[in-house]
């Protein structure tokens, strides 16, 4: 069975993107395990000295590294992604690179 991390790319509790990931998790359960991950608890990116990454980001990176792929469900705000997702991606590319050579579906 394949294992995926499903990033909920918004902090809205009523998001259609959240519902989409929940639908995928339920309806593809026999073929893949999809762990839904909230990103609204990640601190604002601030480029800290010594490239110290917050523990919550390190934990997320470990989940991504262990997964077979990543599914990002995100709304589009003003022709871009939400700030909460941009923030998470900034941390996930600051000295750690868990998504390199990892299949990602948006």
Question: Where do the PLM segments sit?
Answer:
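N-terminal beta-loop-helix "entrance" segment that forms/cooperates
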Residues: 39-55
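Short beta-strand elements in bilobed, periplasmic/extracellular small-molecule ligand-binding domains
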Residues: 31-41
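Secondary-structure boundary/capping motif
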Residues: 13-16, 45, 80-81
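Helix-loop-strand module that forms the ligand-binding subsite of alpha/beta enzymes
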Residues: 53-106
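N-terminal beta1-alpha1 ligand-phosphate binding loop
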Residues: 2-31
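Short, glycine/serine-rich, charged loops/turns that create anion-binding
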Residues: 9-12, 41, 96
């Amino acid at each position: 069975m394949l294992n995926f991390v499903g990033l909920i790319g918004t902090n809205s509790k009523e998001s259609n993107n959240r519902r989409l990931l929940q639908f995928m998790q339920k309806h593809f359960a026999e073929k893949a395990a999809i762990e839904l991950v909230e990103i609204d608890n990640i601190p604002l990116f601030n480029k800290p000295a010594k490239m110290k990454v917050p523990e919550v980001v390190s934990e997320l990176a470990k989940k991504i590294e262990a997964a077979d792929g990543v599914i990002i469900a995100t709304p589009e705000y003003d022709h871009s992604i939400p700030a909460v997702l941009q923030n998470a991606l900034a941390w996930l590319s600051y000295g750690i690179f868990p998504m390199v050579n990892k299949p990602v579906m948006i």
